[in-house]
């Protein structure tokens, strides 16, 4: 009996350890699954975003007077060493944060040929930013997203992108009620060989201009590494109440790398596992999207 009870406890811990990202479907957007959407502007191409509707979403949401927060996400670069595919289908950060309680949208980086999603860096920057400007309001209108409660998050390349793309100009910056970046941040590191991220002095000047467009809205920055650069950079530019910083101890969370869950400490899967940092990030999301929060 004692061994059976122990086995039951261990099984429950394993079951509860990691959330499972909703499966992909070829059908229309629906609760509990990720659907591929090719918009009217990109019919005939492979440019697409993914969307997963909240677990309690129903087609009669308007009649029910229902609205949901929106978590929009930019993925990391193609980087096999960490398991990052660079594709929208590889995203996990936003779902781990919201757990089926929000509309989850994985935004594309529109390739320069406008025929596919880019898996390394930004593709056509203007087209990528325009895609968000067009489709975030569209998704809110079509599926009941609360336009006052849209958070943009990103991992690695996407962590840079929440500012580089999400604060690219005043129009796109107005879409978000808050930003969350995991592992990296716009202006923290020089990206040699790119036109936008080098030399460092110019890059940081441009990043500082972008960051001013946040205008006091909440920013969460989490880091599995690189805190020595990111934290001082933000502390010099932002007031303490508006931004939150947290380290994520990947070794404490996962042990050795690679393992059955992740290949590398630099990953976006940690939000699928319950831990103090996960709970803190989820609490931040709940606060930022609280029903009584003022309009942005």
Spell out what each predicted region is.
Residues 57-66, 117-157:
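Gly/Ser-rich "nucleophile elbow"/oxyanion-hole loop immediately N-terminal to the catalytic nucleophile
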Residues 171-276:
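The feature captures the conserved acid-bearing segment of alpha/beta-hydrolase catalytic domains
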Residues 267, 271-296:
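Catalytic active-site module of serine/aspartate enzymes centered on a nucleophile-bearing elbow/loop
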């Amino acid at each position: 009996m004692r061994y059976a009870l122990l086995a039951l406890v261990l099984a429950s811990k394993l079951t509860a350890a990691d959330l499972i990202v909703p499966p992909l479907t070829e059908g229309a957007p629906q609760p509990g699954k990720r659907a591929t959407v090719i918009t009217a502007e990109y019919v005939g191409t492979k440019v697409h975003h993914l969307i997963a509707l909240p677990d309690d979403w129903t087609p009669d949401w308007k009649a029910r007077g229902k609205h949901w927060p929106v978590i929009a996400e930019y993925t990391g670069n193609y980087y096999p060493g960490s398991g990052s595919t660079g594709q929208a289908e590889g995203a996990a950060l936003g779902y781990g944060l919201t757990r089926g309680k929000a509309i989850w949208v994985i935004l594309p980086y529109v390739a320069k040929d406008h025929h596919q999603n880019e898996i390394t860096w930004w593709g056509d920057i203007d087209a990528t930013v325009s895609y968000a400007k067009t489709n975030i309001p569209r998704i809110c209108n079509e599926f009941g997203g609360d336009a006052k409660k849209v958070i943009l998050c990103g991992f690695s390349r996407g962590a840079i992108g929440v500012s580089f793309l999400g604060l690219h100009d005043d129009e796109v910056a107005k879409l978000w009620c808050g930003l969350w970046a995991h592992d990296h941040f716009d202006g923290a590191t020089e990206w040699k060989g790119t036109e936008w991220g080098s030399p460092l002095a110019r890059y940081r000047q441009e990043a500082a201009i972008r960051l001013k467009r946040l205008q006091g809205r909440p920013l969460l920055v989490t880091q599995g590494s690189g805190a020595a650069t990111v934290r001082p950079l933000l502390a010099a530019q932002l007031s303490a109440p508006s931004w939150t910083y947290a380290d994520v101890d990947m070794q404490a969370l996962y042990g050795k790398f690679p393992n059955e869950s992740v290949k590398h400490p630099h990953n976006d899967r940690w939000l699928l596992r319950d831990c103090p940092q996960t709970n803190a990030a989820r609490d931040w999301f709940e606060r930022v999207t609280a029903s009584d929060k003022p309009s942005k």
